Design a protein with these regions (language model features):
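Phosphate/pyrophosphate-binding betaalpha-module
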Residues: 1-5
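His/Asp/Glu-enriched, well-ordered alpha-helical/loop segment
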Residues: 6, 10-29, 36-137, 141-144
């Protein structure tokens, strides 16, 4: 992707300044610095931001080497990287992404949860039954503790 440059804002600048565009980002603090994450939220507002994980098949697995198609992915404390050092994708879980946005970036928890729930539902066109806790909506949710760890998952109103 083109970078943001002061003389040529490119795709990034267009996404940040076009009010009709939602912006998706991976808040693993590897793909984007916490100050850039804050800049995105300030530029777009909570209604146009979507938290994604882009998690690879190596998510939740031990450190080591894994395959992604025909490429080798090395998982370390520094994320999932290709042999040349480039990021291969993310190994972050959504609860950690939410935690990073709140604890590291400093965004209000209510705004962060909207970016992880209702906003994606709107983009997918399912906001009439997903994305919030309300009468008539599917009761799909994760119950988090005060450190934003998943304690329980509820799907269609049933505890898993």
């Amino acid at each position: 992707m083109d970078t943001l440059h002061h003389r040529d804002p490119g795709v990034v600048g267009g996404g940040l300044t076009n009010e009709g565009v939602y912006v998706e980002f991976i808040p693993d603090l590897l793909h984007l610095n916490k100050d850039i994450l804050k800049l995105i939220v300030l530029a777009k507002g909570e209604d146009k931001c979507i938290i994604v994980t882009d998690s690879l098949c190596a998510t939740c697995l031990k450190k080591g080497m894994y395959r992604l198609g025909d490429q080798h992915v090395i998982v370390t404390d520094n994320g999932a990287r290709l042999k040349n050092g480039a990021l291969a994708g993310s190994i972050i879980m959504m609860a950690e992404a939410v935690r990073n946005m709140i604890n590291e970036v400093g965004i209000d928890p209510v705004k962060v949860l909207k970016m992880a729930t209702l906003n994606p539902a709107k983009v997918l066109g399912v906001e009439n039954y997903l994305g919030r806790i309300a009468e008539g909506y599917d009761a799909d949710m994760n119950i988090l503790d005060w450190d934003f760890n998943v304690e329980r998952t509820i799907l269609k109103g049933r505890c898993l």
